[in-house]
From Swiss-Prot:
It comes from Delftia acidovorans (strain DSM 14801 / SPH-1). It comes from the Bacteria. This is Ribosomal RNA large subunit methyltransferase E. Specifically methylates the uridine in position 2552 of 23S rRNA at the 2'-O position of the ribose in the fully assembled 50S ribosomal subunit. PANTHER family: RIBOSOMAL RNA METHYLTRANSFERASE, RRNA METHYLTRANSFERASE 2, MITOCHONDRIAL.
Length: 217
């Protein structure tokens, strides 16, 4: 049997990089489920989006690192458990291990039964902040992947228009490439203030970036 030594070397290099990543180590130390928590943390510390008493909706929440960060923001003690000053509703197509104080809804938020659960969780109100770390399964085809990424961002924007307060904020993940300029234009059409941010915790070689839209037009 022929062994692909190049592939094995690449996998080993990635594993070494992952194990030695300071954000991976920090996540383990701080009790976060993924290093992604620090991306939202950087964005939030820069823009002060998540405040005590806020209602936050986390789209594409699994495994839950962003919800964990939000939970700590809304805790009077900054704790992972205990009292909570605010509301967190997380949605994903995949199951998520429970987080104390976080209401999780399993399903596609485009479907009526799931939307009904969300509206019930919101108690007739709207979100102060919507965060979306949604990402598609990538095919390797640039055109196809750009379209999939664009669709998820567009869905998050549409969700915010209908379920977020006028003065609220939306954070989405996207990637530089095919549809990037069009998505920035969509944000500028939708929000009063638009800020592209590349957190330090995003990997250097990644084309990943984040867009923040504040205040619906």
């Amino acid at each position: 049997m022929k062994v692909n030594t190049k592939s094995k070397k690449v996998n080993k290099a990635w594993l070494n990089s992952h194990v030695n990543d300071p954000y991976v180590k920090a996540a383990q130390k701080d009790g976060y489920r993924a290093r992604a928590a620090y991306k939202l943390k950087e964005i939030d510390e820069q823009l002060k989006l998540i405040r005590p008493g806020a209602t936050v909706v986390d789209l594409g929440s699994t495994p839950g690192a962003w919800s964990q960060y939000v939970r700590r923001c809304l805790s009077p003690e900054g704790a992972a458990v205990g009292a909570l000053n605010g509301r967190i509703i997380s949605l994903d197509l995949l199951p998520m291990e429970p987080i104390e104080g976080v209401q999780f809804i399993l399903g596609d938020f485009r479907e009526e039964p799931v939307l009904a659960q969300l509206q019930e969780a919101l108690g007739g109100g709207k979100a102060d902040v919507v965060v979306s770390d949604m990402a598609p399964n990538l095919s390797g085809n640039g055109t196809t992947d750009a379209a999939r990424i664009a669709l998820l961002v567009e869905l998050a924007v549409d969700f915010s228009i209908h379920h977020m307060k006028p003065e609220g904020a939306l954070v989405v993940k996207l990637f530089h490439g095919g549809a990037y300029d069009d998505l920035v234009a969509l944000f500028r059409q939708t929000f009063k203030v638009v800020k592209p941010i590349k957190p330090k915790s995003s990997r250097d070689k990644s084309s990943e970036t984040f867009l923040v839209g504040m205040g619906l037009k």
